[in-house]
């Protein structure tokens, strides 16, 4: 496209002025001198990494993970921390619920000796700690557990029964405006865990909503809805959960994909089970009757034995995972993305409250 010479000179002058005032890189052409690929961190689940389209959760962005109680929200975030620490990244956990179990975290592969942990007294304190860690540029992943536990200072200092309408929503709205830019500059991933509430008086449509107003919904680049879909049993004993995660919002790839995987009690996500299932689905692992084979060699009779074989032979498991990632992620990325579809609601954009 040919640009008028006078406009070109004026544009060059104003770009130079902006860069001089705000620093190099403060404004540029979209396709110029920047990587179009988004840096990501694995979720610990290959199926979910593929569903996200980019191979994991995006750095420099806000992510919301929500679902019912005991659905696997904290487990998923601990898996993200473990994956990030394996890459040498620094992680922090803001435990607003005061419920983090270090023994369980260690079982999932988290290096708790190098995990920063804070148990703030108020919501404002938690968000200020988040902002300070972000601005330092030294922390790569921050988890906030949970939005529902971020209680405003005024509510804590008040009496039980006092009305505090919109306080939490206003606090979150102010925090999002402040955090979003800092996260991008420091390339920090901020994950909020959230709980589900029921809208009162809803006759049609989904009555479920999340706490903290709507500001987080707008600022989040990725929103994950995690649900427990069944139980995993060994005989009469329940040893884990069948879990489904739906990507309800995705600004880095196509949304509305879903992933199914298993969470085993005391172990976390069943990665080798995923490798067996995905390997068979994509013809990487052969299944003949009850026998599973890889490259002509039998690896086990029945899914449980094949899973056990891969758990004991980590080199073969790593080879299968690498092949599956190359195969699936090259096809899963999309040229466009869409935000989640919201209902026709009147929204106070300051507090995020629906009225």
Curated annotation (Swiss-Prot):
Chief localisation class: cytoplasm
UniProt signal peptide: none
SUPFAM superfamilies named in the record: P-loop containing nucleoside triphosphate hydrolases (SSF52540), RecA protein, C-terminal domain (SSF54752)
Coiled-coil residue windows: none
Protein name: Protein RecA
Any single biological process term in GO: DNA repair
Amino-acid biosynthesis keyword on record: no
GO cellular component: cytosol
This protein's UniProt keywords: ATP-binding, Cytoplasm, DNA damage, DNA recombination, DNA repair, DNA-binding, Nucleotide-binding, SOS response
Gene3D superfamilies in alphabetical order: P-loop containing nucleotide triphosphate hydrolases
Organism: Shewanella amazonensis (strain ATCC BAA-1098 / SB2B)
PROSITE patterns in the record: RECA_1, RECA_2, RECA_3
Molecular function terms, GO-annotated: ATP binding; ATP hydrolysis activity; ATP-dependent DNA damage sensor activity; damaged DNA binding; single-stranded DNA binding
Pfam family, one: RecA
Family: Belongs to the RecA family.
Domain of life: Bacteria
Subcellular location: Cytoplasm
Protein purpose: Can catalyze the hydrolysis of ATP in the presence of single-stranded DNA, the ATP-dependent uptake of single-stranded DNA by duplex DNA, and the ATP-dependent hybridization of homologous single-stranded DNAs. It interacts with LexA causing its activation and leading to its autocatalytic cleavage.
PANTHER family in the record: MITOCHONDRIAL DNA REPAIR PROTEIN RECA HOMOLOG-RELATED, RECA
The keyword DNA repair belongs to this UniProt entry's keyword annotation: yes
Residues binding ATP, per UniProt: 67-74
